[in-house]
């Protein structure tokens, strides 16, 4: 009934598919970011789901071939960066899958790419800024370290503090997901 009403309002099936898959993709991208912060991994099933969603959306708007070419080139270039040890494998797969979600026009793809780069740089600056703060918190003793805090969020914060203190890798899926979400939001909600 809802689909019939939406179609009666003049919204085409392609827009409805884009809207539905856009909402689903945004949820999966947010989950990828949170999972990367919590565990420093991006599950393969998540990248595969995003890849399938991207393929479905590109099929609906008749740009599957162009989307697959751009996602494939992205994967190959990022794979080379992974081989050099400069990026995690989960981030490579997530970025390639997210590239397929983004419409394959030059303007949108460039916005997505520079969004990832800029947000990744901002993430790096935040991590650099947090190092001195964490040193002061650690110097305050157990109370300063939130030793009494419980719950998932507190554990993630403690783990993140430990990673920052030891100069661990950045959760780059946050930058990839945020850029993809910022790119998809205006496109997904054009009902």
Predicted regions and their residues:
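A membrane-topology feature that recognizes alpha-helical transmembrane segments
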Residues: 1-191
């Amino acid at each position: 009934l809802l689909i019939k009403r939406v179609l009666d309002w003049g919204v085409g099936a392609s827009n409805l598919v884009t809207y539905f898959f856009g909402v689903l993709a945004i949820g999966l991208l947010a989950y990828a970011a949170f999972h990367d912060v919590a565990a420093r991994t991006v599950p393969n099933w998540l990248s595969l789901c995003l890849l399938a969603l991207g393929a479905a959306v590109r099929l609906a708007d008749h740009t599957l071939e162009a989307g697959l070419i751009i996602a494939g080139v992205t994967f190959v270039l990022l794979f080379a960066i992974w081989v050099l040890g400069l990026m995690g494998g989960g981030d490579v797969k997530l970025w390639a899958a997210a590239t397929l979600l983004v419409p394959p026009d030059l303007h949108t793809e460039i916005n997505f790419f520079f969004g990832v780069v800029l947000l990744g740089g901002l993430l790096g600056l935040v991590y650099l800024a947090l190092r001195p703060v964490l040193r002061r918190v650690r110097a305050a003793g157990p109370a300063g370290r939130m030793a009494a805090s419980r719950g998932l969020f507190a554990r993630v914060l403690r783990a993140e503090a430990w990673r920052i203190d030891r100069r661990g890798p950045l959760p780059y899926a946050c930058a990839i997901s945020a850029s993809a979400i910022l790119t998809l939001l205006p496109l997904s909600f054009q009902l």
